[in-house]
Amino acid sequence: MAPAMGNELQHRTVLLEEAVNALVTRVDGIYIDGTFGRGGHSRAVLAKLGEAGRLIAFDKDPLAIATAQQVADPRFEIVHESFASLRDAMSERAVGRVSGVLLDLGVSSPQFDDPERGFSFRADGPLDMRMDPTRGESAADWLARATVQEMTEVIRDYGEERFAFQIAKALVARRAESDRLGPLVSTGELAQIVANVVKTREKGKDPATRTFQAIRIHINQELAELQVVLEAALSLLEQGGRLVVISFHSLEDRIVKRFMQTHSSAPAVDRRLPIRAVDLPSPPLKLLGRVFASDEEVAANPRARSAVMRVAERIAP
Protein backbone atom coordinates (compact mmCIF):
# COMPACT_ATOMS: atom_id res chain seq x y z
CA MET A 1 0.00 0.00 0.00
CA ALA A 2 1.54 3.31 -1.03
CA PRO A 3 0.90 6.33 1.20
CA ALA A 4 -0.62 9.52 -0.07
CA MET A 5 1.56 12.58 0.41
CA GLY A 6 0.05 15.99 -0.13
CA ASN A 7 3.28 17.85 -0.88
CA GLU A 8 6.14 16.94 -3.17
CA LEU A 9 9.44 16.53 -1.39
CA GLN A 10 11.32 19.78 -1.28
CA HIS A 11 14.74 18.16 -1.16
CA ARG A 12 16.47 14.94 -2.09
CA THR A 13 16.45 12.40 0.71
CA VAL A 14 19.96 11.08 1.29
CA LEU A 15 20.63 7.32 1.05
CA LEU A 16 16.93 6.69 0.59
CA GLU A 17 16.95 3.19 -0.90
CA GLU A 18 19.91 2.03 1.18
CA ALA A 19 18.36 3.17 4.46
CA VAL A 20 14.92 1.69 3.84
CA ASN A 21 16.31 -1.63 2.63
CA ALA A 22 18.49 -1.86 5.74
CA LEU A 23 15.64 -0.88 8.05
CA VAL A 24 12.64 -2.94 6.96
CA THR A 25 12.99 -6.63 7.77
CA ARG A 26 9.28 -7.38 8.39
CA VAL A 27 6.42 -5.94 6.36
CA ASP A 28 4.13 -6.24 9.39
CA GLY A 29 6.52 -4.60 11.86
CA ILE A 30 6.36 -1.36 13.82
CA TYR A 31 8.96 1.15 12.66
CA ILE A 32 10.23 4.51 13.90
CA ASP A 33 11.37 7.40 11.71
CA GLY A 34 13.03 9.70 14.23
CA THR A 35 13.28 12.63 11.81
CA PHE A 36 10.33 12.95 9.42
CA GLY A 37 11.71 16.06 7.69
CA ARG A 38 9.80 16.33 4.42
CA GLY A 39 8.81 12.67 4.42
CA GLY A 40 11.26 11.01 2.07
CA HIS A 41 12.22 8.07 4.25
CA SER A 42 8.75 7.75 5.77
CA ARG A 43 7.07 7.53 2.37
CA ALA A 44 9.52 4.85 1.23
CA VAL A 45 9.06 2.84 4.44
CA LEU A 46 5.27 2.94 4.12
CA ALA A 47 5.53 1.79 0.50
CA LYS A 48 7.47 -1.25 1.69
CA LEU A 49 5.15 -2.20 4.58
CA GLY A 50 2.10 -4.43 4.38
CA GLU A 51 -1.35 -3.54 5.68
CA ALA A 52 -0.46 -4.69 9.21
CA GLY A 53 2.71 -2.59 9.32
CA ARG A 54 2.94 0.63 11.27
CA LEU A 55 5.20 3.70 11.13
CA ILE A 56 5.53 6.29 13.90
CA ALA A 57 7.54 9.39 12.95
CA PHE A 58 8.92 12.23 15.06
CA ASP A 59 9.92 15.80 14.29
CA LYS A 60 10.37 19.06 16.17
CA ASP A 61 9.88 21.32 13.15
CA PRO A 62 6.32 22.70 12.76
CA LEU A 63 6.71 22.73 8.96
CA ALA A 64 7.62 19.05 9.00
CA ILE A 65 4.59 18.36 11.18
CA ALA A 66 2.33 20.22 8.74
CA THR A 67 3.67 18.09 5.88
CA ALA A 68 3.27 14.89 7.89
CA GLN A 69 -0.32 15.71 8.77
CA GLN A 70 -1.17 15.46 5.07
CA VAL A 71 -0.16 11.80 4.96
CA ALA A 72 -3.43 9.95 4.39
CA ASP A 73 -2.40 6.53 5.62
CA PRO A 74 -3.92 4.76 8.65
CA ARG A 75 -0.61 2.99 9.28
CA PHE A 76 1.16 6.30 9.91
CA GLU A 77 1.36 8.57 12.96
CA ILE A 78 3.37 11.77 13.48
CA VAL A 79 4.60 12.94 16.89
CA HIS A 80 5.50 16.62 17.35
CA GLU A 81 8.42 15.96 19.68
CA SER A 82 12.14 15.37 19.60
CA PHE A 83 13.20 11.80 18.99
CA ALA A 84 14.69 12.00 22.48
CA SER A 85 11.12 11.42 23.73
CA LEU A 86 10.99 8.06 21.92
CA ARG A 87 10.83 5.89 25.03
CA ASP A 88 8.00 7.89 26.64
CA ALA A 89 6.07 8.11 23.37
CA MET A 90 6.19 4.35 22.90
CA SER A 91 5.12 3.80 26.50
CA GLU A 92 2.13 6.12 26.00
CA ARG A 93 1.13 4.09 22.94
CA ALA A 94 1.64 0.75 24.70
CA VAL A 95 4.29 -0.22 22.15
CA GLY A 96 6.65 -2.72 23.73
CA ARG A 97 9.06 -3.57 20.92
CA VAL A 98 9.72 -2.19 17.45
CA SER A 99 11.20 -3.73 14.32
CA GLY A 100 13.43 -0.83 13.38
CA VAL A 101 14.53 2.71 14.20
CA LEU A 102 15.78 5.15 11.55
CA LEU A 103 17.56 8.39 12.45
CA ASP A 104 18.52 10.88 9.71
CA LEU A 105 20.46 13.44 11.70
CA GLY A 106 21.16 17.13 11.27
CA VAL A 107 19.38 19.92 9.45
CA SER A 108 17.34 19.36 6.29
CA SER A 109 17.93 21.27 3.07
CA PRO A 110 14.66 23.25 3.38
CA GLN A 111 15.71 24.39 6.85
CA PHE A 112 19.13 25.50 5.58
CA ASP A 113 17.67 27.18 2.53
CA ASP A 114 15.13 29.30 4.44
CA PRO A 115 16.91 32.44 5.74
CA GLU A 116 14.13 32.97 8.30
CA ARG A 117 15.24 29.84 10.17
CA GLY A 118 18.70 31.25 10.86
CA PHE A 119 20.69 28.08 10.15
CA SER A 120 22.73 29.39 7.24
CA PHE A 121 25.29 32.14 6.79
CA ARG A 122 24.68 32.27 3.03
CA ALA A 123 21.70 34.64 3.28
CA ASP A 124 20.96 37.18 5.99
CA GLY A 125 18.15 36.30 8.36
CA PRO A 126 17.14 36.29 12.03
CA LEU A 127 19.60 34.54 14.34
CA ASP A 128 17.28 31.76 15.48
CA MET A 129 18.60 28.23 14.72
CA ARG A 130 15.88 26.39 16.66
CA MET A 131 14.52 23.21 15.08
CA ASP A 132 11.21 24.23 16.67
CA PRO A 133 10.96 28.05 16.59
CA THR A 134 8.07 27.94 19.08
CA ARG A 135 10.11 26.43 21.91
CA GLY A 136 13.30 27.18 23.78
CA GLU A 137 16.04 29.78 23.50
CA SER A 138 17.12 31.19 20.15
CA ALA A 139 20.74 31.64 19.11
CA ALA A 140 20.37 35.41 19.49
CA ASP A 141 19.05 35.00 23.03
CA TRP A 142 21.93 32.71 23.98
CA LEU A 143 24.58 34.99 22.47
CA ALA A 144 23.07 37.90 24.41
CA ARG A 145 23.82 36.23 27.75
CA ALA A 146 26.59 33.62 27.33
CA THR A 147 30.01 34.25 28.86
CA VAL A 148 33.28 34.12 26.93
CA GLN A 149 34.02 30.76 28.56
CA GLU A 150 30.62 29.31 27.63
CA MET A 151 30.92 30.48 24.02
CA THR A 152 34.48 29.21 23.78
CA GLU A 153 33.51 25.75 25.02
CA VAL A 154 30.53 25.49 22.67
CA ILE A 155 32.39 26.70 19.57
CA ARG A 156 35.46 24.59 20.38
CA ASP A 157 33.65 21.38 21.35
CA TYR A 158 30.77 21.40 18.87
CA GLY A 159 32.46 23.18 15.99
CA GLU A 160 36.01 21.89 16.46
CA GLU A 161 37.03 25.49 15.80
CA ARG A 162 40.62 26.35 16.78
CA PHE A 163 39.81 30.06 16.92
CA ALA A 164 36.96 29.52 19.40
CA PHE A 165 38.36 31.78 22.13
CA GLN A 166 39.05 34.65 19.73
CA ILE A 167 35.56 34.34 18.23
CA ALA A 168 33.98 34.31 21.69
CA LYS A 169 35.89 37.44 22.68
CA ALA A 170 34.78 39.19 19.49
CA LEU A 171 31.15 38.27 20.15
CA VAL A 172 31.27 39.60 23.70
CA ALA A 173 32.97 42.78 22.47
CA ARG A 174 30.14 43.21 19.95
CA ARG A 175 27.61 42.72 22.74
CA ALA A 176 29.24 45.57 24.67
CA GLU A 177 28.32 47.81 21.73
CA SER A 178 24.63 46.87 21.86
CA ASP A 179 23.52 50.27 23.19
CA ARG A 180 25.03 51.92 20.13
CA LEU A 181 24.57 49.22 17.47
CA GLY A 182 21.59 47.32 18.80
CA PRO A 183 21.67 43.62 19.72
CA LEU A 184 23.27 40.96 17.53
CA VAL A 185 20.23 39.41 15.84
CA SER A 186 21.22 38.55 12.26
CA THR A 187 23.05 35.63 10.69
CA GLY A 188 24.84 37.98 8.33
CA GLU A 189 26.43 39.97 11.12
CA LEU A 190 27.42 36.83 13.04
CA ALA A 191 29.09 35.44 9.92
CA GLN A 192 30.97 38.70 9.39
CA ILE A 193 32.22 38.80 12.98
CA VAL A 194 33.56 35.26 12.60
CA ALA A 195 35.14 36.04 9.22
CA ASN A 196 36.94 39.02 10.75
CA VAL A 197 38.53 36.69 13.32
CA VAL A 198 39.24 33.58 11.25
CA LYS A 199 41.87 34.78 8.83
CA THR A 200 42.95 31.36 7.59
CA ARG A 201 40.62 29.73 5.10
CA GLU A 202 39.79 26.04 4.69
CA LYS A 203 39.44 25.14 1.03
CA GLY A 204 35.79 25.12 0.00
CA LYS A 205 34.54 26.05 3.47
CA ASP A 206 33.19 29.38 4.71
CA PRO A 207 34.98 30.59 7.87
CA ALA A 208 31.63 30.73 9.70
CA THR A 209 30.78 27.07 9.04
CA ARG A 210 32.16 25.65 12.27
CA THR A 211 30.75 28.39 14.48
CA PHE A 212 27.25 28.12 13.01
CA GLN A 213 27.34 24.33 13.42
CA ALA A 214 28.46 24.65 17.02
CA ILE A 215 25.80 27.16 18.05
CA ARG A 216 23.08 25.16 16.29
CA ILE A 217 24.11 21.94 18.02
CA HIS A 218 24.11 23.71 21.39
CA ILE A 219 20.77 25.46 20.90
CA ASN A 220 19.05 22.20 19.92
CA GLN A 221 21.02 19.93 22.27
CA GLU A 222 21.60 17.68 19.29
CA LEU A 223 24.37 15.48 20.67
CA ALA A 224 22.72 15.02 24.07
CA GLU A 225 19.44 14.06 22.39
CA LEU A 226 21.29 11.64 20.12
CA GLN A 227 22.73 9.83 23.13
CA VAL A 228 19.25 9.57 24.65
CA VAL A 229 17.56 8.22 21.52
CA LEU A 230 20.28 5.63 20.87
CA GLU A 231 19.77 4.15 24.34
CA ALA A 232 16.00 4.23 23.87
CA ALA A 233 16.22 2.57 20.47
CA LEU A 234 18.36 -0.24 21.84
CA SER A 235 15.86 -0.92 24.62
CA LEU A 236 12.92 -0.96 22.18
CA LEU A 237 14.32 -3.07 19.35
CA GLU A 238 13.01 -6.59 19.07
CA GLN A 239 15.38 -9.46 18.27
CA GLY A 240 16.30 -9.03 14.62
CA GLY A 241 15.30 -5.35 14.68
CA ARG A 242 17.55 -2.81 12.99
CA LEU A 243 19.02 0.51 14.07
CA VAL A 244 19.89 2.68 11.06
CA VAL A 245 21.59 6.05 11.60
CA ILE A 246 22.66 8.58 8.96
CA SER A 247 25.03 11.28 10.21
CA PHE A 248 26.58 14.24 8.44
CA HIS A 249 29.52 15.32 10.57
CA SER A 250 32.22 13.67 12.64
CA LEU A 251 30.77 14.56 16.05
CA GLU A 252 27.52 12.72 15.32
CA ASP A 253 29.21 9.80 13.62
CA ARG A 254 31.68 9.39 16.48
CA ILE A 255 28.83 9.04 18.98
CA VAL A 256 26.96 6.55 16.79
CA LYS A 257 30.10 4.51 16.06
CA ARG A 258 31.09 4.35 19.73
CA PHE A 259 27.57 3.38 20.80
CA MET A 260 27.28 0.58 18.26
CA GLN A 261 30.77 -0.73 18.97
CA THR A 262 30.21 -0.69 22.73
CA HIS A 263 26.98 -2.66 22.47
CA SER A 264 28.33 -5.15 19.93
CA SER A 265 31.43 -6.09 21.93
CA ALA A 266 31.67 -8.59 24.77
CA PRO A 267 32.70 -7.04 28.09
CA ALA A 268 36.35 -7.34 28.98
CA VAL A 269 37.09 -10.03 31.54
CA ASP A 270 39.88 -9.75 34.08
CA ARG A 271 41.94 -12.89 33.55
CA ARG A 272 42.54 -13.10 37.30
CA LEU A 273 38.84 -13.73 37.92
CA PRO A 274 37.28 -17.19 37.66
CA ILE A 275 34.97 -16.08 34.84
CA ARG A 276 35.02 -17.34 31.28
CA ALA A 277 34.03 -15.12 28.40
CA VAL A 278 31.50 -17.74 27.26
CA ASP A 279 29.73 -17.42 30.61
CA LEU A 280 29.02 -13.73 30.04
CA PRO A 281 25.86 -12.51 28.28
CA SER A 282 26.22 -11.89 24.56
CA PRO A 283 26.30 -8.26 23.44
CA PRO A 284 22.89 -7.05 22.25
CA LEU A 285 23.95 -5.70 18.86
CA LYS A 286 25.66 -7.02 15.75
CA LEU A 287 27.29 -4.51 13.41
CA LEU A 288 26.10 -4.68 9.81
CA GLY A 289 28.53 -2.12 8.47
CA ARG A 290 28.48 1.41 7.14
CA VAL A 291 27.42 2.84 3.81
CA PHE A 292 28.39 6.00 1.93
CA ALA A 293 26.52 7.73 -0.84
CA SER A 294 27.43 6.62 -4.36
CA ASP A 295 29.27 8.90 -6.75
CA GLU A 296 26.03 9.24 -8.71
CA GLU A 297 24.08 10.38 -5.63
CA VAL A 298 26.77 12.87 -4.63
CA ALA A 299 26.77 14.31 -8.15
CA ALA A 300 22.99 14.77 -7.97
CA ASN A 301 22.95 15.91 -4.34
CA PRO A 302 26.23 17.37 -3.01
CA ARG A 303 24.87 17.29 0.56
CA ALA A 304 25.17 13.50 0.42
CA ARG A 305 28.97 13.73 0.23
CA SER A 306 29.39 13.85 4.01
CA ALA A 307 26.70 11.27 4.83
CA VAL A 308 27.64 8.10 6.69
CA MET A 309 25.01 5.43 7.36
CA ARG A 310 25.69 2.89 10.11
CA VAL A 311 23.51 -0.17 10.64
CA ALA A 312 23.26 -2.55 13.59
CA GLU A 313 20.91 -5.42 14.37
CA ARG A 314 19.67 -6.53 17.76
CA ILE A 315 20.67 -10.17 18.23
CA ALA A 316 19.87 -10.59 21.93
CA PRO A 317 16.25 -11.19 23.02
From Swiss-Prot:
Could you say which enzyme class this protein belongs to? transferase
Which Pfam families is this protein grouped with? Methyltransf_5
Q: Name one GO biological process term.
A: rRNA base methylation
Family the UniProt entry places it in: Belongs to the methyltransferase superfamily. RsmH family.
For this UniProt record, give its keywords in alphabetical order, as a comma-separated list: Cytoplasm, Methyltransferase, rRNA processing, S-adenosyl-L-methionine, Transferase
Q: What is this protein called?
A: Ribosomal RNA small subunit methyltransferase H
Annotated disulfide bonds: none
